[in-house]
Amino acid sequence: MDVIKAVKKRKSIRGYKPDPVSKEVLEQILEVASQAPSAMNTQPWEFTVLSGEVLENIRKGNIELLNSGALPNPEHVVTGWPRESVYRQRQVNLAKQLFQLMDIPREDREKRAKWLRRGFRFFDAPAAIILSTDCCLGESGPLLDIGAVIQTICLTALHFGLGTCIEDQGTMYPKILRKYAHIPESKRIVVAIAIGYPDWDFPANKVETEREPIKNVTTWIGFD
């Protein structure tokens, strides 16, 4: 698959087949992704790859805390979007599509809660990649570089027939990740990537998102 086709094909997969993803395939993906650019070749990323019993324990731990009413405590602060902004509207538009595909009425709190829990379970993917960085690098310094390696992981996964979903809900309770995945306190947990073979019969995987026309977000200077 060429690069342009991969970029256009990539989408967030929220439903997966139970088939396991081999360590060998995941290792190949990370080998390629590690070629992503970073400031002065600092490579400020670390990967914790989860599967099997450990991933199941993390799912259960996340859901137990969520159901208990425990407040999320992410180490990478996730901020919302201004209510009247175009950014918030884009998010709302996507949520409407997903809820329609999943047959979740706006007023059905039980179904909405069930959908929310999927994110805390890494969308039931057979594997997940946790991205972390060294705490000595500060809050925002390495984020651009980590964004580059995330995109590269997602694009490379397509070569192996895999789907991905970049998500933060799975990292909302870092103490659960540290307990089962043994991520040291010296590392700041940034984000997760659910990864596996897409279940194309899962309704949410049929969602199609739009992109703002380039003319609306680009200023050309010095061109005829």
Model-derived regions, located:
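Acidic, surface-exposed loops and disordered segments
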Residues: M1-D224
